[in-house]
């Protein structure tokens, strides 16, 4: 069965995810809505969709089964509730919601209506992170002791990502990707967080309150994690990595080059995942399969609600300079 997917948003990630959905061979894009009609039409030409609008409400006229939402987090909430109200499955391009309150409501509505809602963290589907998860959970490096992560991204202060109100803040927009969502999937939900942040590079009124953040978290099993994330990334500096320290070895994820280095008591190997199946394609397949009741989605509302809660705790700790218990 070919599923009809409507798209809200016409930016780069809307294109990436729409093409991944089309590549499944089980979906068609039936309508596109963007604040700017010209943007929707340009996108429509690229993927062969004529039904383009400057509001998302008319998308109902295209008889969609589901909607892909790729817009700033603040208006994303209203679009998600609208889609659920009209009985549509939802693939949200980023975090589940802009606040934990909205995320909890989305989880409740989706469960009550029996609808699929998938948050946008595609990395959980990738071969690299599936291998890391097995590595840690099977204790291949002994007992895990600590984690250190770096996530740097050269943010553009003229875009919504840098806008505190539209984005919900850097911990929500950026740190849930690097690497709260993945660490939660592997280690479980953190117990507490202590964080500090600053705003040095771009300091105009209304921009994100934490441009750079250092967060220390305690995960189940007394695993400690240090996470550095920033919208500052000068030049060609590598910006994505995670180090896992175990009692009998260590592993390092190089997110810039999609490799995994493993050291087990001096026995070293490097695994290259550059040619592995695109996680966006795997997520698209899982999303569509879930329409038939299959338990294929890895970023469900009840799970990804916790990403939002952790991001809020990080922001709260940055402001209070106190440990926040979750």
Name what the model sees in each region.
Residues 1, 27, 58, 66-69, ...:
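C-terminal helix-rich "cap/oligomerization" subdomain common to oxidoreductases
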Residues 1-47:
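N-terminal Rossmann-like dinucleotide-binding module
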Residues 38, 47-109:
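Beta-loop-alpha module in the N-terminal Rossmann-like domain of NAD(P)-dependent dehydrogenases
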Residues 92, 117-119, 227, 253:
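Hydrophobic residues in well-ordered beta-strands that form the structural core
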Residues 105-123, 142-149:
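Rossmann-fold dehydrogenase core element
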Residues 123-207, 321:
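Predominantly a Rossmann-like dinucleotide-binding segment in NAD(P)-dependent oxidoreductases
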Residues 174, 180-257, 281-295:
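Contiguous beta-strand/loop segments that form the cofactor/metal-binding neighborhood of enzyme cores
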Residues 274-285, 302:
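Active-site loop of classical SDR/Rossmann-like NAD(P)-dependent oxidoreductases
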């Amino acid at each position: 069965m070919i599923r009809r997917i409507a798209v809200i948003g016409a930016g780069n990630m809307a294109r990436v995810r729409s093409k991944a959905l089309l590549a499944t061979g089980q979906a068609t894009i039936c309508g596109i809505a963007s604040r700017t009609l010209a943007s929707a039409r340009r996108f429509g030409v690229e993927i062969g969709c004529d039904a383009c609008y400057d509001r998302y409400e008319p998308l109902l006229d295209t008889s969609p089964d589901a909607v892909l939402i790729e817009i700033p987090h603040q208006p994303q909430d209203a679009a998600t509730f609208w889609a659920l109200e009209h009985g549509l499955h939802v693939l949200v391009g980023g975090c589940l919601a802009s606040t934990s309150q909205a995320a909890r409501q989305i989880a409740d509505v989706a469960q009550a209506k029996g609808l699929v809602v998938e948050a946008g963290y595609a990395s959980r589907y990738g071969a690299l992170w599936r291998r890391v998860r097995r590595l840690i959970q099977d204790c291949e490096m002994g007992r895990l002791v600590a984690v250190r992560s770096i996530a740097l991204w050269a943010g553009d202060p003229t875009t919504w990502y840098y806008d505190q109100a539209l984005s919900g803040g850097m911990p929500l927009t950026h740190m849930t990707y690097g690497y709260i969502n993945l660490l939660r999937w592997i280690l479980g939900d953190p117990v507490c967080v202590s964080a500090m942040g600053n705003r040095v590079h771009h300091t105009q009124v209304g921009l994100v309150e934490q441009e750079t953040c250092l967060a220390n978290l305690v995960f189940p099993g007394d695993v400690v994690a240090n996470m550095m994330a920033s919208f500052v990334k000068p030049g060609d500096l590598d910006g994505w990595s995670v180090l896992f320290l175990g009692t009998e070895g260590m592993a390092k994820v190089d997110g810039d080059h999609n490799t995994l280095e493993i050291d087990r008591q001096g026995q070293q190997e490097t695994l290259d995942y550059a040619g592995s199946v695109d996680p966006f394609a795997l997520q698209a397949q899982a999303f569509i399969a879930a329409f038939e009741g299959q338990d294929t989605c890895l970023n469900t509302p009840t799970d990804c609600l916790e990403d939002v809660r952790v991001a809020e705790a990080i922001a709260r700790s940055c402001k209070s300079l106190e440990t926040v218990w979750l």
